[in-house]
Amino acid sequence: MEKLEALKKHFGYTAFRSGQAQLIDQILAGRDVLGIMPTGGGKSLCYQLPALMKRGTAIVISPLISLMKDQVDGLVENGVASTYINSSLSGTELAARLEGLRRGEFKLVYVAPERLNAREFVEIARMLDISLIAVDEAHCISQWGHDFRPSYKEIPKFIQRLPVRPPVAAFTATATTFVKEEIK
């Protein structure tokens, strides 16, 4: 399926916004990308569409439970099998979602960076065909990764544990030169 056809089918749009097509092409080609686009500029679509076009499951690292829920709700409304795994879930909900992930039921799974250190999640991820890893709000790697959310600095270790390195797509609305270097 061509990307414009997939865009129309999954999201109802007939054209890309500025910069989206180029980022999507890079991800589909298996390259790492850093997308810096304004708030409301369509960053999420730049990793969601490739996730739908590629085989496997995309892991999306997101800093806030509310962002995860909003993204997953929108995807599910569009008929996309997706979920989030975070601390808001009960033990039963968590077990059910991990089992669904293990069975490959989801095209996208949203997690906080801390989840990448959870033994059971890492074991499941190592068994999956991971299409890509997306880091939403990637400026948090620099701004939160040093003290407040040190798990952001652990993302490369998680990627190294995977049997096959997937493309990594990082997205943010704001990034200074220093932040860009830290993300890379």
Residue ranges and their predicted role:
Residues G30-L49, I59-S62, F171-T172:
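Walker A/P-loop
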Residues A58-V60, I65-A118, E182:
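Conserved nucleic-acid-binding Ia/Ib motif block in the N-terminal RecA-like helicase ATPase lobe
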Residues A51-M53, L75-E77, E99-G104, E123-L128, ...:
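Conserved catalytic network of the ASCE P-loop NTPase/AAA+ motor domain
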